[in-house]
């Protein structure tokens, strides 16, 4: 029997039966909860409001309570929290009082990975898509991985799945440095950029050092898959004391993309390999940034034994990830309709990648964007970059900053961005009341426009409302 055919038996976490998640509806929490529930643990959790995610968990037998109360942790042997959960939370306090272990989400993910052959995907941008593509290729190759992803994989309808092999593919989160808990066999680094700098005391060198520390969690026989097109990753390469597979458009990449051609939502390119014949592939996602994400997935999957046919099928059949260039359908308004795309990107580099993909795939169409800045600190730190990138759209409507629990910062809000953009010759429309949005869109849009809802806050929910109000898929 081949090694890939062996069902990997996961040892029980000793003495642990009941596992309680505080904030179980969070994108980083629900996937781990789902995998553990499918392994047979008694999972419970709480959150502050209902959501489709909670309904899915309940369908798996998970007990979910709305609101945080001490009695919610009854029956728990361990309590799992995320960085979004306050240490004064009633359930966390009750766990400490009862001497029940309280562990961060990343530590529980690390425990899942410890019993498997872990593939961890790190980087400031592209983690979710790269993790999803890796899982898709490995599934096509019959490797049947468990995966935990920071977004909904459209083909699976969920962000996590318990596979029957020894493989676990998961995102590695640098935002709070929690990826240092992970000890994978293989690791991808897509890029390193200035974001979540409060975690690193505003010190970029500390961020770089933390990525090196993460890579050195690999065993000496592990492999680091790194994007040499990213200047920071290239700078870090000499410090990596592990085997490295380099990927990118650069001539010195071990896995290189060339002959890139975009046809709407489909991107065609050739994979040139240091060993083996070139491979022509088609990816069901637009943009050169997604070509890089695909190269990383190809590199790590091939290293684990995925063949060319599985790679071709995995990319060609890929149906995308929720809120990652997610085409919602046609939005109808007085005067015509616009194609509505929803995208999670909230860093200037991510917004620029979305704009570039649209310009490449839909040349000649006007680009209208409804943008919601995410966090006042990010808006302040990357203010000029946001102004530069947003000035590249044809029509811009802007919502107020999604605070994510932060206090407002003077001069780092949506009105300030609008003022700065007007100096660039763009006339952005500040949306002070989302209830007025339909009327504002009707006044700004033209028939045939491409409308993007962009950001990490509740703008994704607004996109769904627009589709419902404006005629849905058509």
Swiss-Prot record:
What keywords appear on the UniProt entry? ATP-binding, Cell cycle, Cell division, Cell shape, Cell wall biogenesis/degradation, Cytoplasm, Ligase, Nucleotide-binding, Peptidoglycan synthesis
Q: Where in the cell is it found?
A: Cytoplasm
Which Gene3D superfamilies does the record match to this protein? Mur ligase, C-terminal domain, Mur-like, catalytic domain, NAD(P)-binding Rossmann-like Domain
Q: Where are the transmembrane segments?
A: none
Q: What one GO molecular function would you report for this record?
A: UDP-N-acetylmuramate-L-alanine ligase activity
Specify whether Hydrolase is a keyword of the entry: no
Question: Do you know which PANTHER family this protein is assigned to?
Answer: UDP-N-ACETYLMURAMATE--L-ALANINE LIGASE, UDP-N-ACETYLMURAMATE--L-ALANINE LIGASE-RELATED
What protein does this entry describe?
UDP-N-acetylmuramate--L-alanine ligase
Lineage of the species this protein comes from = Bacteria, Pseudomonadati, Pseudomonadota, Gammaproteobacteria, Oceanospirillales
């Amino acid at each position: 029997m081949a090694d890939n055919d062996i069902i990997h038996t996961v040892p029980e976490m000793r003495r642990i039966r009941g596992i309680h998640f505080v904030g179980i509806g969070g994108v980083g929490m629900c996937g781990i909860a789902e995998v553990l529930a499918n392994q047979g643990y008694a999972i419970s959790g709480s959150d502050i409001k209902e959501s489709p995610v909670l309904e899915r968990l309940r369908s798996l037998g998970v007990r979910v309570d709305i609101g945080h109360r001490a009695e919610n942790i009854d029956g728990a042997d361990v309590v799992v929290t995320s960085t979004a959960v306050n240490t004064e939370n009633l359930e966390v306090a009750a766990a400490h009082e009862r001497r029940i272990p309280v562990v961060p989400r990343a530590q529980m993910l690390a425990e899942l990975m410890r019993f498997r052959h872990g593939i961890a995907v790190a980087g400031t941008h592209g983690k979710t898509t790269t993790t999803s593509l890796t899982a898709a290729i490995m599934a096509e190759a019959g490797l049947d991985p468990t995966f935990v992803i920071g977004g909904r994989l459209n083909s699976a309808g969920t962000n996590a799945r318990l596979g029957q092999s020894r493989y676990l593919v998961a995102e590695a989160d640098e935002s709070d440095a929690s990826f240092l808990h992970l000890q994978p066999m293989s690791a991808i680094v897509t890029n390193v950029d200035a974001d979540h700098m409060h975690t690193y005391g505003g010190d970029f060198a500390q961020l770089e050092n933390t990525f090196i520390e993460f890579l050195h969690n690999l065993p000496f026989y592990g492999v680091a898959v790194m994007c040499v097109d990213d200047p920071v990753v290239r700078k870090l390469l000499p410090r990596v004391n592990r085997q490295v597979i380099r990927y990118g458009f650069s001539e010195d990449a071990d896995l290189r993309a060339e002959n890139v051609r975009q046809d709407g939502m489909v991107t065609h390119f050739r994979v040139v390999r240091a060993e083996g014949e070139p491979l022509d592939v088609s990816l069901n996602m637009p943009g050169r940034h997604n070509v890089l994400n695909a190269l990383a997935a190809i590199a790590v999957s091939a290293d684990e034994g995925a063949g060319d046919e599985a790679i071709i099928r995995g990319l060609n059949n890929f149906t995308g990830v929720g809120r990652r260039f997610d085409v919602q359908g046609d939005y109808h308004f007085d005067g015509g309709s616009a194609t509505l795309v929803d995208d999670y990107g909230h860093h200037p580099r991510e917004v620029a990648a979305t704009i570039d993909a649209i310009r490449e795939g839909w040349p000649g169409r006007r680009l209208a964007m409804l943008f919601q800045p995410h966090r006042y600190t990010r808006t302040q730190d990357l203010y000029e970059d946001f102004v530069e990138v947003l000035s590249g759209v044809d029509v811009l409507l802007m919502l107020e900053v999604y605070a994510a629990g932060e206090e407002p910062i003077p001069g780092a809000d949506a009105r300030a961005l609008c003022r700065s953009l007007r100096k660039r010759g763009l006339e952005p429309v500040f949306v002070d009341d989302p209830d007025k949005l339909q009327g504002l869109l009707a006044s700004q849009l033209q028939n045939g426009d491409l409308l993007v809802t962009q950001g990490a806050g509740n703008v994704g929910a607004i996109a769904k409302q627009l589709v419902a109000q404006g005629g849905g898929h058509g």
